[in-house]
Structures are given as structure tokens and as C-alpha cells.
Amino acid sequence: MTFLFIVITLLALIFGAILGFASIKLKVEADPVVEKIDAILPQSQCGQCGYPGCKPYAEAICNGDEITKCIPGGQTTIVKIAEILGVDVPTMEGIEEPIEKVAFIDENMCIGCTKCIQACPVDAIIGTNKAMHTIIPDLCTGCELCVAPCPTDCILMIPVKKNIDNWDWKFDAKLVIPVMNVDGSEKKLVVGE
């Protein structure tokens, strides 16, 4: 029994040393500029830039693609990327400011299929199989990736109207989103406390 323990321990040490050596010898060096740009991007993996995630978009930027495609990152991200690359910040003339939207699930039509939950890159949708789902407005980036997979078309994208109360002041403030119920009554959803 002791002999078996010693043999297994020696094998574990030998294989551990081989793996440690291989990880150092076969290490692939990443482009540090790509890593810096990827760290600045919002990591929502929403695909609004035309790439499947933030890392591929960072690589495309280093290969000469436009730096203005990240909608969730906004102007601040564009300025930071321009600083890293040492280029001028492109003018935003002719480029419309995207309308900020939040997904809303009509809970009377939701069948609980969980397809929207699987599609959401930021886990802004909560619910379980065969039960109603709902959206957490603070987490929703408005990427619309949850709309297409929904078989009952119960997900609507509602524009968030900017006013003095819900504008992004960069400090803890309440976000009020007007929500129209199915019965026609209107209520206000307060988030961000």
C-alpha cells in the first residue's frame, strides 16, 4: 500500500514538472496593445460592433478596423482607445447617438422557454424553465440579442427617455423607467438604489 502511494506521488510530481515546463516553453505571447484595448471594452459580448465578442473586436482594431463601433462603450471608450493607439479621436459628425433601449418581457405571453436567458450576454434576464422571465433593467445593455430567439415575440425593446432624473450622472442615482402594463395602467419601475 505504501509502495503504491509512493509511485503515484512520484508520477504526479513528474507529470506536474512536465506540465510546468511545457507551459513556460510553449507559452504564446499575446499582443499587449490588444490586451489593453480589450481591458477598456465593456465586456458585454453583445456583438453590436459586428464581432462575436470584445476580444475579436480588440484584435480587429489593432488590425486597422474603426474604433467607433462599440455602442455600449460610448464616447469614453473611443477616447481611451484612441489614446492607446496614438491616433486622433474621430469626429462623431454624421454618426447618430444610439437610442438607449431596455428589453421588456410581456409576462402574459412568456412561455418560459429560457431561450432569451441563454442569449443574454450579461445575465440581465431571470427566470426558470416553464416560468415567467423578467429583465433586470440596470443590467440590460440593449443589445437586442434576446429578441430573435424568443418564439412568442414577447420581448420588446423600450427606449429609455433621458431626463434630469435618469440621466447617467456617474454616481448612485435612481433610474426610473416608465412601464405600460397589459391592462393599460402605467407604473414606474425604479432601479439602481
Curated annotation (Swiss-Prot):
GO terms for biological process: electron transport chain. The gene is rnfB. It is found in: Cell inner membrane. Gene3D superfamilies: 3.30.70.20, Electron transport complex subunit B, putative Fe-S cluster (1.10.15.40). It comes from Haemophilus influenzae (strain ATCC 51907 / DSM 11121 / KW20 / Rd). It comes from the Bacteria. Belongs to the 4Fe4S bacterial-type ferredoxin family. RnfB subfamily. [4Fe-4S] cluster 1 binds at residues 46, 49, 54, 70. The keyword Electron transport applies. Its EC number is 7.-.-.-. Its cofactor is [4Fe-4S] cluster. This is Ion-translocating oxidoreductase complex subunit B. [4Fe-4S] cluster 2 binds at residues 110, 113, 116, 150. Part of a membrane-bound complex that couples electron transfer with translocation of ions across the membrane. Binds 3 [4Fe-4S] clusters. One of its GO terms (molecular function) is electron transfer activity. [4Fe-4S] cluster 3 binds at residues 120, 140, 143, 146. Pfam families: Fer4_21, FeS. Residues 29-87 form the 4Fe-4S domain. Keywords: 4Fe-4S, Cell inner membrane, Cell membrane, Electron transport, Iron, Iron-sulfur, Membrane, Metal-binding, Repeat, Translocase, Transport. Residues 101-130, 131-160 form the 4Fe-4S ferredoxin-type domain. It is an enzyme of class 7 (translocase). GO terms for cellular component: plasma membrane. Residues 1-23 are annotated as: Hydrophobic. The complex is composed of six subunits: RnfA, RnfB, RnfC, RnfD, RnfE and RnfG. The keyword Chloroplast does not apply.
